[in-house]
Regions:
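Secreted/periplasmic carbohydrate-active enzymes, especially glycoside hydrolases
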Residues: 1-106, 110, 116, 121-122, ...
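Glycan-recognition/cleft segments
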Residues: 159-195
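Substrate-binding/catalytic cleft of secreted carbohydrate-active enzymes
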Residues: 551-558, 567-839
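A carbohydrate-recognition surface predominantly in extracellular/luminal proteins
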Residues: 124-149, 157-159, 315-317
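Short, aromatic/His-centered strand-loop micro-motif at the edge of beta-sheets
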Residues: 195-218
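Localized edge beta-strand/strand-to-loop motifs within extracellular or lumenal beta-rich domains
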Residues: 215-229, 332-334
Length: 940
C-alpha cells in the first residue's frame, strides 16, 4: 500500500499574524490580492501534479461498459419454475379524463365543481392540473377547505416559520413547465406566497394570512404586467413579483410531498381576455386513444418529460402456462398502475409498492397475455431547491416475473450474518413456508456466486416460520474483496424437492463499538459521496433521476470507487429508491451504501399524535433488499428542524420499526438536525451525544431511540467546513460546542454525511458545448468567500480553491476523529446542470477536488494537522498519521518542494503505529519567500 497527500503553503517573512488563515473576519489573513495570487500558484501546482491539461473522465465509457457486462449475471432457481419477463411490447397514449382540460392524478374526484384530494398513507399524493388558452389572464379565484387534522399543532403553537424545504398544499400558475406564481398552504396554519426571485431554487416566503380549518377559505389573485396581488378571505394580502414573466396557461394543484389528510379545492372564477369562466368541469368528448408503438423495450422501462406528459404506458407480453399456482411479482409500477391478464382486469397496484398476486384463475393452458398499465406522474416539484425546470419526472415499470408454485412453497428468505471468526461465518437463515404441513423437510445450500459448486450447510425439518443458525466457511464481504455467495433453500416432501428459493448475499458484520464503525471487526471510515442522480444528457434527467439504466448505476458506483470512496449515501431527492439493482451493483463492486427506501424523508412525517403511519410500509421496503451486504445503514430523514417531543417520537418510532425488521445494521433516523446550539442561526432542538443535555447544555433526558446502540450521529456542518463561502478562521476554530463530544463518544460513531465547497465546471468538453448552465446560485458562495476579488476568479482558480478546501477539511476532520465524510454530491446535474459543489461535473469529468478527495479518502495518510496556509519564514510541520493499524510499521517520507519542484527539505523514517491516529515528531524549517508543496508518502 502506498498513499500520497499534499499540503500547500505560502512563506512570506512579512506575514505577521498568529494564524495562517486563508481568510478571516478580523483581517488577520491573506489579503484579497494575495488570495488570488495563492490560487494561481496552487492551480499551477495542481495541474502539474495531476497532469491536468484538458478535462478527463473519472471513469471512461469503456470501463463502464466492461464493468456493466461483468456484473450482468443472474442467479437461477433449480426447482422453482420462474417465467421472467425481461422485455415487453410498449405503447403509449394520452390518459383519458372525464372533464375537458383537466388531468387528475392518483385519487382526485369532483363533485359540484369541487375537487376532493384523498390522501393515503404514502405517496403518490393526489394532484390535479387544468390547462387553458388565453392571451391575457387577469384574475383567478379559488377556495379551499382543510380539516383540523392537517394542522401540525407544534408548528402552529410555536409559530414556526416555514422553510424552503417544507412541504404543503400548493396552488401554482405556470406557463407550460415554467412557474409564474406559487401559493403554499403550510401545516403551521398559514398560507404564503412563494417568490422565486432572485433565486428560483430557494423561494422567499411571504405570509398572506392564517387559514381557517373546517371552513371555506377564499383566495383572489389579480394579475398585472409586472406583479400580482392577492386577497385572502377578502383582505388584501400583498403585492408580489412573478417568479417568471409569461402568460400562464396551466393551473397546478399539488398535495405536497407527504400525505396528511383529505382536503378540497374549488376553482371559483378565471378571467381572461375579458371573459370570466365559472364552470370549470365540462364533460370531455370521447377521443380515440391514438396509441404510439414503441416496439420491444427492456425492463425496467420508463418515460417522462413534458413531451410525454399525461401519457399512459401500456406494456404487454405473451407467455405459456402449463398448470400450477401462478404468482405474478411486479417490482413496482411507479407511481401506480393496473394489471390485466388476457384482457381481464386482475388488480391495481398499491401505489408504487411491490405487487404480488396469485393470477392462476385468470390463466388458461397455453398462450396467455400479461398487460401492465402505468399511469403518468403528476408534474410535482418535491425538491425546489435542487429541481430541474421540467417537473414531469419519469413513470416506470420495474422488474416482472411469474413464479409457478407448488401447494407448499418458500417465501421471505432472509440471511443475516450474526458472527465471524476468521473465515468461519455464523449465519441466521429464516424463511416462511406457505401452506406448511408436517413432514416437510428443508436443505440449505451455499455456493460462490455466480456459478460455484454447492455445499450443504443445513438439513432438517422445515417449519411454517423457519429459523436456524448455522456455521460454515466463507470469505467475508469487504469493499476490497466483495465475496458473494448464493444461498439456496430447498423444500422437500416425501424425499423429493418441490420448491426452492434463492438469494445472493455476502457475509459481513457492520457495527459500532467504542464510538468507531467496524466492518468485520476492523475500524473503518465511511468515505464517499451522495448520489443525487441528475445524470446526463440534460433532457434525460427526468428519466434517470428516478430510474437510471443499470449501466448508469454502474457508472456512479465506479466513479465513487475511483474517488477512493467506500460508501454511497443515496439521496435521490423527492423519490428515494428501493430498486434492488442499486444494492446488487454495490454488492458486486464492493461499495457500501446508506439506504432510504422509496419513502425518502418519511421519518419527517412522524408526529406525537399519530406516530409513523408509513412505518409498516418502510419495514416492508426493507425486506425487499434485506439480503444485500452493501446496505450498511437505514436512513429515515435528511434535514429536520425538531422540537423535543417530535425528536423523541421520531427516534423511538424509527428505531423500533427498523430494529424489528433488521437489528444487524446501523441506523440514522435523521442525517442532520443540529440547528441551534452554535451551529447555524436557526433555532432547533437536539440532544448532546449522551442524551442528558439539550443543544444549550441544559439538563434534558432523551428517550430510548436517541441512545440506541445502533444509532449513529450524523451532521451536515457546512457552516464550519468552509461551506457557503465561510471564512477560514471559522473552520480552524470549529466553535460548535456539541461537536467535541461527538468526536470523542464511546457510544456512537459520528459521520459528516454532507459537506462540500463549490468549484466551477470546465466547459472545454464536447458535452458542455451542447449544453451547460453557468449562472449557478452557488456562485454567491464564492462572492462571499472572495469579496472584491471575486471578479478575478475563473474556473481554474475556482477549482483550485475547491481542492484547497477539500484537502484541508478532509484532513482536519480525520484528525479530530470523524468516522465518515461524504461530499455533496458525487456529480453535477442538479439545478438544471448548474450545481457546482460536486468534484465530478455533470458529464463525469474530474475537477481538481476529485484528486484531493481521492488522496484524502485513502485508508492511511499523513499530513500537517494544522489547517493553515501562510507562514512568516519558519514553517513548523506537525505531522499526523491516520488510518493506521495499531502495532503495524509504516514508512513515512516527507518532502518540501519549491515552485520549481526542487526538494528543499526531506525527512524519512519508519514508525510503529500506536493508535488509529497519532502524532509524529514535529519539525521546523526556515524557508525563503514563495510557495511550497509539502508532500507526504506513506508505505506499509
Amino acid at each position: 500500500m502506498k498513499t500520497e497527500f499534499y499540503d500547500f503553503i505560502k512563506i512570506d517573512k512579512n506575514y505577521k499574524y498568529k494564524n495562517g488563515d486563508f481568510s478571516a473576519a478580523n483581517g488577520e489573513c491573506l489579503t484579497a490580492e494575495e488570495r488570488i495570487e495563492f490560487l494561481k500558484a496552487y492551480s499551477d501546482f495542481l495541474e502539474k501534479k495531476n497532469g491536468y491539461e484538458m478535462p478527463e473522465k473519472a471513469v471512461s465509457d469503456e470501463e463502464t461498459e466492461r464493468l456493466a457486462a461483468a456484473l450482468k449475471y443472474k442467479i437461477a432457481h433449480k426447482i422453482r419454475k420462474r417465467i421472467r419477463v425481461d422485455e415487453m411490447a410498449a405503447e403509449t397514449y394520452e390518459k383519458p379524463e372525464n372533464f375537458s382540460s383537466w388531468q387528475f392524478y392518483h385519487g382526485v374526484s369532483e363533485k359540484n365543481g369541487e375537487l376532493t384530494f384523498s390522501d393515503g398513507v404514502i405517496p403518490p399524493v393526489p394532484c390535479a392540473k387544468y390547462e387553458f388558452e388565453c392571451e391575457k389572464l387577469t384574475s383567478f379565484a379559488f377556495s379551499f377547505v382543510l380539516p383540523e387534522e392537517y394542522i401540525d399543532e407544534e408548528k402552529k403553537n410555536g409559530k414556526v416559520i416555514p422553510l424552503t424545504t417544507d412541504t404543503g398544499r400548493i396552488i401554482e400558475l405556470r406557463r407550460g413547465v415554467t412557474e409564474m406564481l406559487k401559493l403554499q398552504i403550510y401545516r403551521n396554519g398559514e398560507i404564503h406566497a412563494r417568490v422565486g426571485i432572485p433565486d428560483p431554487y430557494h423561494h422567499r416566503n411571504f405570509k398572506l394570512g392564517d387559514f381557517k380549518v373546517d371552513e371555506r377559505n377564499t383566495v383572489l389573485i389579480d394579475l398585472y404586467e409586472d406583479f400580482y396581488e392577492v386577497k385572502f378571505n377578502g383582505t388584501p394580502a400583498g403585492r408580489f413579483e412573478f417568479t417568471n414573466k409569461a402568460m400562464p396557461d396551466t393551473l397546478f394543484i399539488s398535495g405536497g410531498m407527504h400525505p396528511v389528510c383529505k382536503w378540497s379545492f374549488k376553482p371559483e372564477s378565471l378571467t381572461a381576455d375579458g371573459k370570466t369562466t365559472t364552470d370549470f368541469f365540462k364533460v370531455a368528448e370521447p377521443k380515440e386513444e391514438g396509441k404510439q408503438n414503441l416496439g420491444r423495450v427492456e425492463l425496467p422501462f420508463k418515460i417522462g418529460g413534458a413531451k410525454n406528459k399525461d401519457k399512459i404506458i401500456e406494456l404487454s407480453e405473451k407467455f405459456v402456462y402449463d398448470g400450477g399456482r401462478a404468482v405474478l411479482n411486479i417490482g413496482s409500477l411507479d407511481p401506480c398502475g393496473k394489471v390485466y391478464i388476457n384482457e381481464k382486469f386482475a388488480f391495481e397496484t398499491d401505489g408504487f409498492l411491490k405487487g404480488e398476486k396469485d393470477i392462476t384463475k385468470f390463466l388458461k393452458t397455453g398462450e396467455n397475455e400479461l398487460k401492465l398499465l402505468v399511469y403518468p406522474r403528476a408534474p410535482e416539484i418535491n425538491y425546489s431547491w435542487h429541481r430541474n425546470k421540467d417537473p414531469y419526472i419519469a413513470w416506470l415499470a420495474r422488474d416482472v416475473y411469474i413464479d409457478i408454485l407448488p401447494e407448499g412453497y418458500i417465501r421471505d428468505l432472509v440471511v443475516k450474518t450474526v458472527g465471524i471468526s476468521g473465515n468461519k461465518v455464523k449465519a441466521e437463515i429464516s424463511f416462511k413456508t406457505v401452506n406448511f404441513k408436517k413432514g416437510l423437510k428443508t436443505k440449505i445450500y451455499l455456493a460462490k456466486s455466480p456459478c460455484g459448486e454447492e455445499e450443504v450447510i443445513f438439513e432438517g425439518d422445515a417449519a411454517e416460520s423457519f429459523e436456524t443458525e448455522t456455521e460454515f466457511g466463507a470469505n467475508l464481504w469487504t469493499c476490497e474483496n466483495p465475496a458473494l455467495y448464493t444461498v439456496r433453500v430447498e423444500l422437500i416432501e416425501n424425499g423429493n424437492p418441490v420448491d426452492d428459493e434463492i438469494c445472493e448475499t455476502g457475509f459481513r458484520i457492520i457495527e459500532q463499538k467504542n464510538g468507531d464503525i467496524l466492518l468485520n471487526g476492523k475500524k473503518i471510515l465511511l468515505n464517499g459521496a451522495l448520489w443525487m442522480q441528475f445524470l446526463p444528457p440534460y433532457e434525460n434527467i427526468v428519466l434517470s433521476h428516478i430510474c437510471p439504466t443499470t449501466k448508469e448505476i454502474v457508472w456512479q458506483a465506479a466513479m465513487t470507487k475511483a474517488l477512493n470512496g467506500n460508501v454511497a449515501r443515496f439521496h435521490m431527492l423527492g423519490y428515494g429508491n428501493n430498486d434492488p439493482r442499486f444494492a446488487e451493483v454495490c454488492d458486486r463492486l464492493g461499495l457500501m451504501n446508506i439506504w432510504t427506501t422509496r419513502l425518502i424523508d418519511s421519518a419527517e412525517t412522524i408526529d406525537v399524535k399519530n406516530g409513523w403511519r408509513a412505518g409498516k410500509i418502510y419495514a416492508e421496503q426493507m425486506q425487499e433488499v434485506i439480503n444485500h451486504p452493501s446496505i450498511i445503514m437505514w436512513e429515515g430523514s435528511n434535514e429536520f428542524h425538531s422540537s423535543r417531543a417530535v425528536l423523541d417520537k421520531m427516534y423511538d418510532e424509527f428505531v423500533k420499526t427498523v430494529k424489528a425488521a433488521d437489528d444487524t445494521r446501523l441506523i440514522c433516523p435523521c442525517s442532520h438536525l443540529y440547528y441551534g446550539g452554535g451551529l447555524y442561526g436557526n433555532k432547533g432542538f437536539y440532544y448532546q451525544d449522551d442524551g442528558k443535555f439539550n443543544q444549550d447544555f441544559e439538563p434534558c433526558e432523551s428517550s430510548f431511540g436517541w441512545k440506541d446502540e445502533n444509532v449513529v450521529r450524523s451532521s451536515h456542518n457546512y457552516e464550519i467546513l468552509l461551506g457557503y463561502g465561510n471564512r477560514w478562521d471559522i473552520f480552524r476554530e470549529q466553535a460548535w460546542k456539541s461537536q467535541p463530544a461527538l468526536f470523542k463518544s464511546k457510544d456512537h460513531a459520528y459521520i459528516i454525511s454532507e459537506f462540500a465547497i463549490v468549484g466551477r465546471q470546465d466547459n472545454r468538453t464536447k458535452e458542455a458545448e451542447i449544453y451547460h448552465k453557468d449562472d449557478s446560485y452557488e456562485l454567491a458562495d464564492e462572492k462571499r468567500a472572495f469579496g472584491e476579488a471575486y471578479e478575478k476568479l475563473d474556473f481554474k482558480l475556482s477549482q483550485a480553491y475547491q481542492a484547497l478546501c477539500a484537502y484541508n477539511t478532509v484532513k482536519y476532520m480525520r484528525y479530530l476523529g470523524a468516522d465518515g465524510l461524504m461530499w455533496c454530491s458525487l456529480s453535477g446535474g442538479a439545478n438544471d446542470g448548474s450545481y457546482i459543489k460536486p468534484p465530478i461535473d455533470f458529464y463525469g469529468y474530474k475537477k481538481q477536488a476529485f484528486y484531493a478527495l481521492k488522496e484524502g479518502f485513502a485508508e492511511t495518510i499523513c499530513f500537517d494537522k494544522k489547517a493553515e496556509v501562510a507562514y512568516n519564514g519558519k514553517y513548523v510541520c506537525e505531522p499526523v498519521l491516520t488510518g493506521a493499524e495499531k502495532g503495524k510499521t509504516y514508512n513515512v517520507k516527507m518532502e518540501i518542494k519549491n515552485q520549481s519542484g526542487e526538494v528543499v527539505c526531506e525527512r524519512g523514517f519508519a514508525v510503529k503505529a500506536t493508535a488509529f491516529t497519532f502524532d509524529l515528531e514535529p519539525f521546523a524549517v526556515d524557508l525563503k519567500n514563495g510557495y511550497y508543496s509539502v508532500e507526504y508518502l506513506v508505505e506499509a
